[in-house]
Amino acid sequence: MMSGVQPVAVYALRVPADGALVPAVPDAAAMFRVSMAAIDPDEAPEFDDDSSRRPRATLRIIRAPPGLDEEDSDDDYEDEDDSEDDSEDDEEVNGGPSDKEKARKLKEAAYLKELEDAMSEDDESDEGEEFDLKAAISKLVKGKAPATDDDDEDAESDEGLDLDEMVVCTLDPERNYQQPLDITVAEGERVFFKVTGTHTIYLTGNYVMPIDEPRDDYDEDDDEDEEDYDLSPDEDELDMDELMMGEDDESDDLDGLENPRITEIDTDEEEAPKLVDAKGKKKRGADEAALEAKDDKAKSAANGESKKQQKKLKKNNGEASAVEAKPEQKETKKVQFAKNLEQGPTPSKERKPDEKKPADKAEKTTGTLGVKEVKGVIIDDKKLGKGPAAASGNTVAMRYIGKLENGKVFDSNKKGKPFTFKLGKGEVIKGWDIGVAGMAVGGERRITIPSHLAYGKKGVPGIPGNSKLIFDVKLLEIK
């Protein structure tokens, strides 16, 4: 996902090419990110023999079993000693699986203590001590399996058990002498690096710490900030977008479409009294107003002879009649326009130019509103954007609010510098790469991401394991 951490110090580690297990940090109380692995291409290769094979070095990462830190193991060890002293008779009577489980825990604590002692030794250790360190980790890994008689024997005798090692990269001094990485190790993880080959590998990166933003008073104190990110397309939001993006041409076009509609509705409500006022200014009585209404009805159903009679009446009235005819036609058009706003478009010539503008607007929008599921991610489009859709490889600028299922906000970007990333390149959690694809500039949608497309079983600070994440996102720019 978006980065939930910030760098605080430089991380650097030298891993010699002797196959030794090098702890990633002196203790497991620091969180760090490895961003580069490199070798010195001018360094002379160190071959084990006089072989003429190609010089290269392979970096591997080894992780101790999770959930076995030193304090917990020591506490378990002390608790087991107390329980043995207090209930020695019970153990003699109630033998069975419980005894094996206690023995396994004691053995795990002993192996972990052996591992910590080996880690605290000087770097200039001999090969035998190196082998003991590897054997201690091997026993610790094996201790996580269910305890059996065979396991007890193997744990004591099979010190050469191979650990599960993951290859990170292979470097050579000719072409690939450095490799960008993005490996984050959480606080409390016990991680080791190992290099085999002809060159020492140098790891660099940063010590990092989670970004801790206060969220307890979010609902009470951040109401105004919440208005900066509202899914309803109101004028405040359009203004915010203009300030952030520096582009207001499209928003002005929309405002030009909507304001005349509002004006016509208001004038429609006020035009009825004006008809009477205009007649009053020209000193027409109530009888004349009634006669005018009858004339309007006669116009819709009269034959050719009645039209000629009406023309004669207008000629007899002189200029006053001509002046009055124009306001009547104008008022009729305005009433007709207001009616169209409520009941839909009309084929009249006066309305046709206005009908093209909403059509053009519909052609610019991208996608469809509604809920759909894409590769396990539930997407609910609240507002469609305009222009081309975001595709893999595009750099996108986003606003977002991230929540858990219980409504707790764990992260957000509602103002200031937008969050940017390259879509489809693994710079964010997989659910974001899926959920943001297809959005257009100005689009808003809600993305519901299952845990296996977010942070999985482990989670991160502020997000428990197996958490489903809900994001309200808005696309500001596609680069």
Curated annotation (Swiss-Prot):
Its EC number is 5.2.1.8. It catalyses: [protein]-peptidylproline (omega=180) = [protein]-peptidylproline (omega=0). Residues 393-479 form the PPIase FKBP-type domain. It comes from the Eukaryota. One of its GO terms (cellular component) is nucleolus. InterPro entries: NPL, PPIase_dom_sf, PPIase_FKBP_dom, PPIase_Fpr3/Fpr4-like. Keywords: Chaperone, Isomerase, Nucleus, Rotamase. It is found in: Nucleus. One of its GO terms (molecular function) is peptidyl-prolyl cis-trans isomerase activity. Residues 272-299, 325-334, 348-364 have a biased composition (Basic and acidic residues). Residues 39-106, 141-162, 205-367 are annotated as: Disordered. It is an enzyme of class 5 (isomerase). The keyword Chaperone applies. Belongs to the FKBP-type PPIase family. FKBP3/4 subfamily. Binds to histones H3 and H4. PPIase that acts as a histone chaperone. Histone proline isomerase that increases the rate of cis-trans isomerization at prolines on the histone H3 N-terminal tail. Proline isomerization influences H3 methylation thereby regulating gene expression. This is FK506-binding protein 4. The lineage of its organism: Eukaryota, Fungi, Dikarya, Ascomycota, Pezizomycotina. The gene is fpr4.
